[in-house]
Amino acid sequence: MVGACLRRIAHYDRHGIALNAVPLLNPKMFEEAAASDWRRRNGAALGPLDGIPYTAKDSYKVSGLTVAAGSPAFEHLIANEDAFTIGRLRAGGAVLIGLTNMPPMANGGMQRGVYGRAESPYNADYLTAAFASGSSNGSGTATAASFAAFGLGEETWSSGRAPASNNALVAYTPSRGVISVRGNWPLVPTMDVVVPHTRSVPDMLELLDVIVADDPNTRGDFWRAQPWVALPKSSDVRPPSYTGLELEGALRGMRLGVPRMYIGRDTDIAIQTRASVLELWQQAAADLRRLAADVVEVDFPVVSNYERDRPGTKNMVDRGLIPKGFAEREIWDLCVFAWDDFLRANADPAIPDLASVDGAKIFPQPPGTLPDRYEDSFDVAEYVERAKRGVTPFLAIPELEAGLKGLEATRRIDFEDWLDAQRLDAVVFPAVADVGPADADVNEASAALAWRNGTWVANGNLVWRHLGIPTVTVPMGTMADIGMPVGLTFAGKAYDDTRLLRLAGDFERFGQRRSRPPRTPELPDDVFFARHNASMPGETPPLTVALAAETRHAGDQDEITVTLDVAGTGIETSVKVHVNGEPIRMQRTGARFTGRAVVPAKGHERIHSVWRGVYGSIVTAVVRLEDGRAAGAYMVTGGIG
C-alpha cells in the first residue's frame, strides 16, 4: 500500500500534472510499513489502522521531521515529538506517507507558501480550496487523489471544510476539546481544531476510534488548558465505538433547517450561489426528504448577528456579550503567546522562541501575486516585534476570561436556543456558494470571483469555529458545468458531534455522490500484491533492500540509472521498480538488479516554489518473497526530495 501511494505521488504530484500536495515525504515510511507487515503476519496487529498510509498537514509535529507550517521562516524547524494525533496513529500502526501543503502558518487558503500550493485533481482551472480560508489544501488534494487512505487537516475559519467540499471528501470539525490539538502549530487558539479528511463516513469513523481520546497533557491545546470554561473529556462525549454507530435511519424524523442565505432565497444578503450548486442542493433536499427528514427554510441569526449583515442586527460586542477589547487581545496577545509557547515547547535551539524568528520570512508575498483582500489585515511579522517586547502569559491577558465566556454564551443564545425555539435538530446547507478560479492570485477578475462571500471562505465564515459549533461535511455531488465537487454541511449543538456524524452517514449511504477525480485515474501497473498469510518465525532473516540512483543530463533528456541490492534468504516472486510512477525493466545479476529510465529534463526544471529548488525524480522499489515477506525503498535523484 505504501509503495502504491508513493508511486501515485511520484506520478501525479511531483511530476506529470504536478498537483504538489505532498511536498515532504517520510523517510521512514517503508521501514514503518515493513514493521506493520511483520505484525500483521504474526497476529500482532495494533488495530484496524495498522499499516494504513496517511498524510498530515505541514503544521503537525512529527518527531524528527520539519514542522514549517508552510512558512519560509520555519522551513528547517525540527519537531521534537509527535503531535497528539500523530502519536495516536503511530501507536495504532498507521504509516505516515508525508506532510501536505499549506499557506504560511495556515493564515489563508490558497496563497503560496514555502512549498507553493496544491492544485485540483478535478479541474486544473479551479482552486482545490477556498482562496481566503482553505489552508488544508494539500490534505484535500492528497486524500481525493488517493495519495493516502486519509489525511489530517485543520480548521480555524474553513480550512478543513473548504478543501473537503472542493474534493468530494468527508470533513469533521469537532466541538471544543474533542480532539486534542496539542502539537499542532496554532493560528488563532480560540478557533483552531483538528479536521480529519476521508473519502467516506465509515472511513472517518474508523479514524475517529483511534484519534478521539483523552489527552492528559494540555499544553498547546488552548481550550483544554484554559480554566474558565469547563469542557467535557473526550471519553465523556464520544461513543464507545464510532464504527458501531447505526447510520441507516438516522435522518428519519429529523427536522433540519436550511438557511435561506445559502440557497439563494435571502433577499437581504447577496451570497451569489452558483446555479449548479443550487441544482445539487435541490437533489440533496429531495433525498433528505426521502430519508424521512423534514427540511425547512430558515433565517440564520447566528451568522446575521455575528456579521451584522442586515439592519437591526447586533453583534457580540453590541449586546455586551464580549468586551470591546477582546478581539484585539485575542488576535494579538493570545496569538503571540501561543506561537511563542509552541516554539518553546518544541525546544529547537535554532529557533527557541518567537523573538528569535525572522519576521519578514513568516508570510512573504510571492513575486507577481495580488494582495489579499481581508478586512483589517495585518502583517504577522508584527508578532515577532511584540514578542521581543515581552510575551504575556495567557492567564494574565486582560479580558480573555470574559471573552471566552461570551463566545460560549453567544453560541447558546444565537444558535442552540434558536434551534430549540425553531424545533430544529440541526441545520444543513451547501458547503460553499462557488469555487474560485485557479489564477485568482494573479488575475484581478478571477480574484473578484474568488473573494465573494460564500466562495472566499466556506459558508458560515468565522462563525462555526469561533463559537465552537461542530460540523460534518459530506459530498453533495459534482457540478455539471465545471466538474468540481461541492459538499453538504450538517451543523448542530456543541457536543452533538455523534448525531451529526450519523446524519451525514445516513445521507451519504443514500446514493453515490462522490466522483473520483478525473485527473488522477488508477495507474495500470499497480504495486499491490496478493497477501501471503503465513506467519513468520521471529528468527527468520529480515529482507532488506538497498536502492541507489544517479541522474545524467543529456540535452533535453535525463538518464536515470538504478541499482537495487536485495539481502535475505528466499525466492523473489516480484520485484517492481518505478521512476516517477512508470515501471522500468530491471536486469538481475545475483542479488543485484539494475535498470535505467529516461525522463524529460524539463521535469527537473519545473518550479513549484520561489523559495526552494526543483523536485527530483522519485525512484521506488518493492520486493516480495515467496514466503510473503516484503521490503521497499525509495530515493530522489536529480533534484530535492
What are these regions (language model features)?
Residues 1-75, 105-107, 222-233, 239-242, ...:
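Short, well-ordered alpha-helical
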Residues 2, 245-247, 273-299, 345, ...:
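Acyltransferase
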Residues 6-13, 26, 33-40, 44, ...:
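Sec/Tat-exported extracytoplasmic proteins
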Residues 14, 145-262, 267, 282-290, ...:
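Structural helix-boundary/capping segments
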Residues 15, 46-192, 222-225, 259-261, ...:
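Short glycine/serine-rich loop/turn segments
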Residues 49-69, 250-266, 315-413, 430, ...:
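Short helix-loop capping/hinge segments that flank enzyme active sites or metal/cofactor-binding pockets
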Residues 290-312, 389-393:
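Short connector loops at secondary-structure junctions
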Residues 391-413, 421-466:
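An extended, acidic, His-containing surface patch that forms the Zn2+-binding/catalytic region
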